[in-house]
Amino acid sequence: MIDIQNINFSYKKKSFLFEDFSLSVANGSIVGLLGKNGAGKTTLLKLIAGLLPTQNGSIVVNGFVPAERKPSFLADVSVIPEEFSLPQLSISAYVSALKPLYPNFGSEKLDKILAEFELKRNDKLHKLSHGQRKKFLIAFALSCNSKVLILDEPTNGLDIPSKSQFRKILVSSVTDEQIVLISTHQVKDIDSIIDTVVVIDNGKTIFSNTLENVSRDYRFETATELNTAENALYYEKSFDGYHCISSANNDEETHVDLELFFNYLTTKMSKI
């Protein structure tokens, strides 16, 4: 479990990026972490991974304080950063060097994912394209079988077929004992695989709930007439009419349009 209570964080003497920030994430969750540019998504992931220290409050991840960076904690956390560099090694050499750090590493799992991504152990990392290197990092991180998997913009650099592969591989690879945190601006890339959505804005959690509850509490539909859309909680004009969010009122559940819902939440906050 991830339990964040009343943390403060700022870079140098700048104003607080997070002030009195709290968030809880249960084991078995695949969380979509959403927010505008500069909202602090990457910083939050670094705090959870122990790459940055908090300045107040507490973060506890599966019983560990991340900033203490105990080896037993680090062995159970895998991070795929948005920006990365890899050494001039073969995949095989890279894996041989790093897999001893992860006691639950699965070599057979790695080989299976590499094959699905059309990568080979003798491939040279520095000769791969950016998208291929990203796919290798995804394969390695999933093969670590860490209890916490942190993915910062994992679909950046992937083409459309690779994004589909990523979704299928992720869903088939994780277990109910793991927590997966995915920060992204590409909402449509993850809306079919996450079960929980967290939205942060201005240093606060403005929404945290399961997609099941969102589907139960809100109705997503397309209206053809403006007067119908104007009665909704929120709407956006589109080529096929007006995409609307309304209160569910015990209606039949509808598919959650996560991008529309994110826009609704952030627009609502901007008016407060």
For each predicted feature, which ranges?
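ABC-family P-loop ATPase nucleotide-binding domains
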Residues: 79-136
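Catalytic Walker B motif of ABC-type/P-loop ATPase nucleotide-binding domains
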Residues: 149-153, 158
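The feature captures the beta-strand-to-loop junction immediately N-terminal to the Walker
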Residues: 34-36
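A short, flexible loop at the N-terminus of ABC-type nucleotide-binding domains that lies
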Residues: 1-20, 27
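Helix-to-loop junction immediately C-terminal to a conserved catalytic motif
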Residues: 49
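Conserved ABC transporter NBD signature motif
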Residues: 57-68, 72-73
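ABC transporter nucleotide-binding domain
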Residues: 165-245
